């Protein structure tokens, strides 16, 4: 079909982070948009405010006469009743990644991929480009704190997107800038081997437009290996802490909930001192990727600085949920060993009290593959509480549970407990909480709800230390 505003697009699984962002941009472009999901939430309510029709649950009645195209999330099973009916009616069906690529490829796509830091880096890049006056469009996998938006249609040339490598859908993109944070052995349920993951990322770089470039984290071995690939005729730039990178930072300092650092370009030297309002050296690296990309686009330094100074993160990325009785509750999406370690280290950098982590393992397949590494990544927590696995729709695997992670943590001396029943965690926390504790709910599932529940029942005072 021809993609022209006015056509009717129905989206199955519309409440998801990626799908809801696409729905917003399509509606802003003038398409008629409807969608269904098992759960409705604040995001779908905001879509209704701009004219998107939302159906709770899946039903044949949701697919009205006149729908021109159906877009489906990868989380929706192929036997979904709305998908089946669309096939019967010969309504064209696109996957989420294909629709995202159609939108982004129509402009200069700035695509952020990699195992870690995608949402934060994408959000930073959007804020920087917007503050520099380029009026970019964006779709990101988490809401920007302070705006409650995960997408926006801009009038400018750039379209900043979080590229999803989990199912190789990022290979539908033809990026102007391909930014890769790092490449790790994640999503092996799809790729089957690390070699296949690397092949996909190489293809992603190969698909960069001739006038574009790759911005690559220089501390990643795979990214560095691309330099030796003589058949890859692309402009490759590197960022990181090491002075061998095209862009690097020195003199990083943790200051409160943020940090300061000096940015350099290899052939030019010192470029400026930057301030961040989000914690951790990993976020300084995310910011450096945004800084380097913006400077390569010829944008001015001062608006880049001010954008990052005023960036307060994306939802579920070290998000402070509240404080009560001098106990601070933070939520973070970290669900891979590298992310878990970085988040705990960031907390340690600014917090003088105890750091207590409530970690919810995500997916049985990931827990089976990375259970030991997940447990070992919790080592710097004063206490790690491990819950049962959040299945994300997967079938349970015999012998695989949160206890696997807990045993791995205990084996290296991490003080950890396995509490599979969610309703038992808050009473346990209430017994042990003391002043100046920092409690981090952590994982890609629904563990964030527990932090809010804890704040509701925390007494006005807890044990003093």
Swiss-Prot record:
Subcellular location, principal: cytoplasm
Is this entry keyworded Signal? Answer: no
Give binding positions for ATP: 114-120
Enzyme nomenclature, EC number: 6.3.2.8
Top enzyme class of this protein?
ligase
Please name the pathway. Cell wall biogenesis; peptidoglycan biosynthesis
A GO cellular component annotated for this chain's UniProt record is: cytoplasm
Q: Which Gene3D superfamilies match?
A: Mur ligase, C-terminal domain, Mur-like, catalytic domain, NAD(P)-binding Rossmann-like Domain
Q: What does this protein do?
A: Cell wall formation.
What's the name of the protein? Answer: UDP-N-acetylmuramate--L-alanine ligase
Q: Which organism is it from?
A: Syntrophomonas wolfei subsp. wolfei (strain DSM 2245B / Goettingen)
Organism classification: Bacteria, Bacillati, Bacillota, Clostridia, Eubacteriales
